[in-house]
UniProtKB/Swiss-Prot annotation:
Pfam families with a match to the protein in the record: Ribosomal_S8 (PF00410)
PROSITE patterns: RIBOSOMAL_S8
Record key words, sorted: Ribonucleoprotein, Ribosomal protein, RNA-binding, rRNA-binding
HAMAP family: Ribosomal_uS8_B
Disulfide bond listed as a keyword: no
GO MF term list: rRNA binding; structural constituent of ribosome
Any one GO cellular component localisation term in the record: ribonucleoprotein complex
Subunit annotation: Part of the 30S ribosomal subunit. Contacts proteins S5 and S12.
Protein name: Small ribosomal subunit protein uS8
The organism of origin for this protein: Nitrosospira multiformis (strain ATCC 25196 / NCIMB 11849 / C 71)
Amino acid sequence: MSMSDPIADMLTRIRNAQLSEKTSVVMPASKLKAAIAQVLKDEGYVEDFIVHEAGGKSILDISLKYYAGRPVIERIERVSRPGLRIYKGSNKLPNVMNGLGVAIVSTSKGVMTERKARANGVGGEVLCIVA
């Protein structure tokens, strides 16, 4: 059976790995997952990520980040989902925890944070929020 929401699966794997204090988490890769991982790395929520081939399939390996023994990511949630897509214009993008968190948005100019999308004047699909 195919997976109905691979992005929700990615976020759940990250959340569960951090709760069990794993150093890294491995999952099937895609261009969108790699773009989300890049945003998480740029914003300082994960140490690093690597996309590599294993048995003819692409694998995404994300190194998780901790501060003082606690996970850096306190909250990671899917917003737009296959059954209910959420699209917002540049002026309606959510402000997560008054700027302490980020919303990851898929725009026509690529996957970016809501701050960069607002600065570029583009809206898009709100994939998830991270705090």
